[in-house]
């Protein structure tokens, strides 16, 4: 849909999704969980033009599944993903990535992933 003159192009104004009820993460995050978060951050950082949004969503969803399993807390999962997203190069200068939009995308995808907990996280 093409926005009209009266519609805002400011993607940062989108309301944030509600935070899901999630299990408490362990006091110490398992090294394998941290490796998976680092891998997601790396994938986001290296995402090429045309694949950035999909890469951000896929990585955040995958980490969200670990959040849902209780392997990592919501904030510990979202923070590095958001930082990687904000650092993405904006290939389209007319639509630069904004912190608010990245935060919205990450929280939404992590929340959706948390609704489908990763069964492998139970053995971490």
Describe each model-derived feature in a short phrase:
Residues 1-124:
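Modules that initiate DNA replication and primer synthesis
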